[in-house]
């Protein structure tokens, strides 16, 4: 017969305290630093679809091509878009082609080779402004419509899609 080791009361108490601390850290992390919004609309297809649930990390530190959640004064709602222009960049859209600082930008993540060329844009971004576009360029209200987005309106960066819409449907 084996002798079963029993935990000392002090060790059991320390394990309970450690479990409580870890639970608190996770709660605070998920409550204040990570959100799980649901995509509304088709503007980010094919990357994300209407109904997809995203994990978003609260941060203002975003980089080129990051997908972010931002507040839109014009639409009076949060939007999910891709960062196309950074502070100090010159963005031009002409003839359905995108140029950043005079260089044509080719984007493998969009389906449309030619997108709505009726919208012409030329903007110099200020030190606290970003240019955001939806991946579904022909069906997106974005910086082409409402202009540059101030840094203060960016809520956070999309980490991943945690649940695709097709996984949410039950038959």
Language-model features, listed with the residues they occupy:
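Protein maturation boundaries and topogenic segments
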Residues: 1-78, 90, 149-171
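Phosphate/adenylate-binding glycine loop and adjacent helical scaffold
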Residues: 134
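Conserved, short, structured surface segments that act as functional micro-motifs
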Residues: 131, 147-148
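Short Gly/aromatic-enriched secondary-structure transition segments
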Residues: 98, 148-149
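Structured, soluble extracytoplasmic/luminal domains of envelope-associated proteins
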Residues: 83-124, 129
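Active-site loop architecture of trypsin-fold serine endopeptidases
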Residues: 138-145
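Active-site/binding-pocket entry motifs
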Residues: 61, 99, 104-106, 138, ...
């Amino acid at each position: 017969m084996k002798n079963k080791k029993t935990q000392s009361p002090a060790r059991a108490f320390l394990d309970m305290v450690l479990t409580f601390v870890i639970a608190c850290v996770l709660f605070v992390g998920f409550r204040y630093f990570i959100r799980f919004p649901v995509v509304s609309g088709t503007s980010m297809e094919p990357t994300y679809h209407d109904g997809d649930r995203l994990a978003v990390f609260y941060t203002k530190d975003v980089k080129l091509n990051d997908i972010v959640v931002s507040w839109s004064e014009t639409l009076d709602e949060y939007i999910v878009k891709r960062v196309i222009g950074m502070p100090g960049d010159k963005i031009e859209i002409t003839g359905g082609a995108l140029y950043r600082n005079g260089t044509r930008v080719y984007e493998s993540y969009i389906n449309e080779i030619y997108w709505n060329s009726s919208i012409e844009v030329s903007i110099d971004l200020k030190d606290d402004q970003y240019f955001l576009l939806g991946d579904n360029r022909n069906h997106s209200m974005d910086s082409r419509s409402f202009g540059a987005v101030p840094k203060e309106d960016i809520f956070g960066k999309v980490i991943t899609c945690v649940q695709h819409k097709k996984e949410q449907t039950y038959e």
